[in-house]
């Protein structure tokens, strides 16, 4: 962990624990072990501060800011340990069309595939239309439902103890907004994951994988049809760049005019 990254509500940097590990190490280890034993994160570790970071030079609306969550150092250690447990399984879960946070995968691969698919759509001579949908997931972290996260983790066969622990991390958050060098009154969110939480990127790509799984179900049921860049090539229905792309064979025949 970076020693002097912005601290959470407790005001303690990771560097503080690193410097005084001989004094505080045993207490921290006991607390982390207790969380993994009980599968529950205590409320005092759940407290989070939100700071608004401008996305552009001169922000004018709330949409021009990115909310970053400042979590307590001990909480970050817990979620990093959870990430260590689930990261080794991601290669077996995440499709090859997702590249974020997965080792040995390159974003340039998907860029090339997208270009080839769009090129093939442009030169297609069939009398059937094609459709490419670019989905910009605005405020995606804020809009993920907790029930969806639980359903997704169960569907991917994560062990019950990991599911309980992740849901405890996600759904028991007390948040306060930093504003004008002070903290506003805390509130309890009812959905979403935190930007700045080490666990959040992995929950997000798993959620996107579940979306892809649902689309594949539609394709297998012949309700949607994926497309191919060539007759003998693989079929594509969904993959990911910075945005989400969905490639479909449009089920509307083009009628020739007399």
Language-model regions: role of each:
Residues 1-258:
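Nucleotidyl polymerases of mobile genetic elements and RNA viruses
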